[in-house]
Amino acid sequence: MLSPAPLYNDLAVGPTNGTGHWVTGQDGVRIRIGVWNSGAKGTVLIFPGRTEYIEKYGGAARELLRHGYSSVAVDWRGQGLADRLQLDRNIGHVINFTDYQYDVQAMLRAADTLGLHKPYYLVAHSMGGCIALRALMQKMPVQASSFSAPMWGIAFHPPVKRVMAWGLSTLAHPFALSETRAPGTSITAYVTTEPFATNSLTCDAPMFAQMKAHLEAVPDWALGGPS
């Protein structure tokens, strides 16, 4: 079921015909999709990374349209304007990582309902790359896929931190701590406190400034550390 949702076209700086839609997944969680439906060559499904939101990909949608493609991006559960699963909306939490597949299925159903141009293609970044890999293994109907820094593993330096993470995650569930913020992570969004000179996200100063401006304009997009 689709219903109108906000899409901040002025902040996205994407194609001018962007529309937002609420979509409810099979498990009842409501997500948001943003659609730019002008390119007739096909539609690119955009799978954002953790902490991201649709409007961050307006520039990508503009470039895709320049090459003849429509696009659709998603706010995953727990981030952007999609349903947050905890009272503290700054904690990025999902019950099971596989639950993101409900969002993928809802996104695909919405694309079909809206009659978006086929074939479908995929661009996936970071955490979106991990979600996309599982979806592809489950035969998601896309013609081709492109991955940007996919989260197919998490680097720990020094490696002993990986052992500590395993131990903490194993103990968190029986002690009812699995929904609390992971140790060492912040309650605030990274780009709101980290200076550009020392940030680990991008070497593109205008992009970093844009991300910061986005969260100042729409604080509800902000997300702190994961559970």
Task: Mark where each language-model region is.
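An N-terminal hydrophobic leader/cap segment in hydrolases
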Residues: M1-G25, V29-W36
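Active-site glycine-rich loops that stabilize anionic/oxyanionic intermediates
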Residues: K41, P48-E52, A60
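Alpha/beta-hydrolase fold active-site loops
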Residues: K41-V44, P119
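Structural cue for short, hydrophobic secondary-structure segments
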Residues: I46-G49, A73
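Conserved alpha/beta-hydrolase
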Residues: I54, A61-L87
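Alpha/beta-hydrolase active-site loop
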Residues: G92-D112
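Alpha/beta-hydrolase fold nucleophile elbow
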Residues: G115-S126
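Alpha/beta-hydrolase-fold enzymes
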Residues: M127, I131-G224
